[in-house]
Amino acid sequence: MELGSMPMLARERDWAIAARQDIALLDQIARTIDGPFHLVNPASFADNLAAFQRVLRERSVAGRVYFGKKANKAAAWLREVAKLDGAVDVASVPEFVHTLANGVRGEDVGVTGAAKSDDLLWLASRHGATVAIDALDELERAIAIADQARPLRVLLRVLPPKSPNSRFGLNPTDLSAALRRCGEAQQQITVEGFSFHLDGYAVLPRAELAATLVELCKETRSQYGFPCSAISIGGGFACAYVEQDDWQNFRERLDPSQFHAEKSFQQFYPYHQSPTGASMLDAILATEVGSEMLASKLIAAQVALYLEPGRALLDGAGLTVFPVQGFKRNAEHGIVTVAGLSMSLSEQWKNSEYLPTPMLVQRGPDRPQERVRAAIGGSSCMEYDVLTWRKILFPAAPRHGDLIVYPNTAGYQMDKNESEFHQLALPPKIVVSQEGGAFTWRMDQP
């Protein structure tokens, strides 16, 4: 089987299938927006968040699920967080303000990122947020700001031992210095515990480092009297965009000839993984470290588990629609040009490719159903403005007025690298809900 005809079909939620098959819905939105747009479904996000929270309850582990806000800027997600008593992870003043404006309380906000601004630290202090301290100089600024505002709740971010070259986290020497300094500044700083973030999506390293931090919490309580009642294991919760067989076949048959201009890629996101989402959290908690499950260690030590999923909370919760502006044949394959830019499909700007297969929604008069392979380009003047280099097998030649639907794009794809290049408007986010089997839609609120 040729790679170009392989399915790589996305695993879709029922709402997404129904929405892309609802021609009247897409037609109404397309005529209103007159350009590319994103559909977001808060109900799917809420289901994902509830699943993570359910794992914590069923394992009898105290904890909080912080939505990694950087994964998508829509306000709709924040309203669901507030409804479900969740929390939000932010890394800038605008993210913090946006979160508060959508009903999430300050004490339910976690502040991460490197070298936070004074304004961000001040907001965190005023609103009772928890701050992950990443460096000694940041700690000094936090102490000074808390002295003028309110005592600051902090987690000390630990440099993972197996990632010594990471630019994030306190090495052992700095961690010891930070603890001593916090001991001197207990009027300004409350050490709630420790945090880390690991690259990749493996279960075992997260469980092992979490267990190490549980022991560190116990030692620090004894030595300094800090509460040390929580650890954060960060994000990196896996998703499965396509079925295992499709992903395996794709990798085995990968060849530059299947891409426009024989484009080659060094790596792809792992589009099929297991376990994923809340099941991965359950696997982490069930992992035996030493002679005891991590969940048991947390319970015995009375340490809460914080986590910061982004992509995993957005899995299945959005899709992106690009109107077709034109189609032409180029040698043995065609080029579809869509309204919009590849910056609205962010994976393309990581020297990679978003692989779940885009789908053609045919509009207008009937046409011959003669299959054609085509790559998909944006409407800019740049040769490399390409949304899909892979030659997709379409059931018919796309034409002006059709729509191209990219599935499952809510996690990082929609707005991570968006740009108003050529003064083109950014694709708006459209919130869709189903009531009595019919869709309603509205613009996402700022």
PLM features per residue range, with description:
Residues 1-133, 139-144, 150-151, 186, ...:
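A charged N-terminal "starter" segment
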Residues 91-94, 112-116, 151-160, 191-196, ...:
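Non-cysteine beta-strand/loop elements that form the S-adenosyl-L-methionine
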Residues 202-203, 208-446:
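C-terminal active-site-proximal or functional interface alpha/beta core segments in diverse enzymes
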Residues 135-190:
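Conserved anion-binding
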Residues 71-73, 94-95, 115-117, 135-139, ...:
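Active-site-proximal loop/turn and secondary-structure-junction residues that shape catalytic pockets
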